[in-house]
Amino acid sequence: MPREFSRSDRVSAQMQREIAEFLRTGIDAPELGMVTVSDVDVSRDLAVAKVFVTFLGARLETRAAVKRLGEFAPQLRQVLGRRMRMRIIPEIRFAYDDSLERGLHMDEVLRSLNKDGDL
């Protein structure tokens, strides 16, 4: 019987939980505001993890906030190394998740089309 989830999917899910906990309790960076980990995409060979984040109440521009978050990657890898049972912890790369903004934009477009009677 095939497994329901691949190993990379299971690692992604565990990393998402651990990274969210680390960002909530392990860093002192009030300029980032509240950081939400929306997804973690781990490569098939488990070498790289792309962590998608959003910011609420950040005092920095998005790019600067992602760069600032990247400064915590080495410390985060150490924490993950202690908490996860893996021989090698993936390299962590942070990226801003703009899916919410794109969704809101699509909603505005659909509303304007509906208002104009085009839908």
UniProtKB/Swiss-Prot annotation:
Presence of the UniProt keyword Cytoplasm in the record: yes
One of the protein's GO biological processes: maturation of SSU-rRNA
Gene Ontology, cellular component aspect: cytosol
Main localisation: cytoplasm
Entry keyword set: Cytoplasm, Ribosome biogenesis
Localization per Swiss-Prot or TrEMBL: Cytoplasm
InterPro entries: KH_dom-like_a/b, RbfA, RbfA_dom_sf, Ribosome-bd_factorA_CS
Top-level division of the source organism's lineage: Bacteria
Keyword presence, Metal-binding: no
SUPFAM superfamilies to which the protein is assigned, alphabetical: Ribosome-binding factor A, RbfA (SSF89919)
A Pfam family of this chain: RBFA
PROSITE patterns in alphabetical order: RBFA
GO-annotated molecular function: ribosomal small subunit binding
Assembly: Monomer. Binds 30S ribosomal subunits, but not 50S ribosomal subunits or 70S ribosomes.
Family, similarity comment: Belongs to the RbfA family.
Function statement: One of several proteins that assist in the late maturation steps of the functional core of the 30S ribosomal subunit. Associates with free 30S ribosomal subunits (but not with 30S subunits that are part of 70S ribosomes or polysomes). Required for efficient processing of 16S rRNA. May interact with the 5'-terminal helix region of 16S rRNA.
Protein name: Ribosome-binding factor A
Origin species: Methylococcus capsulatus (strain ATCC 33009 / NCIMB 11132 / Bath)
Biological classification of the source: Bacteria, Pseudomonadati, Pseudomonadota, Gammaproteobacteria, Methylococcales
Gene that specifies this protein: rbfA
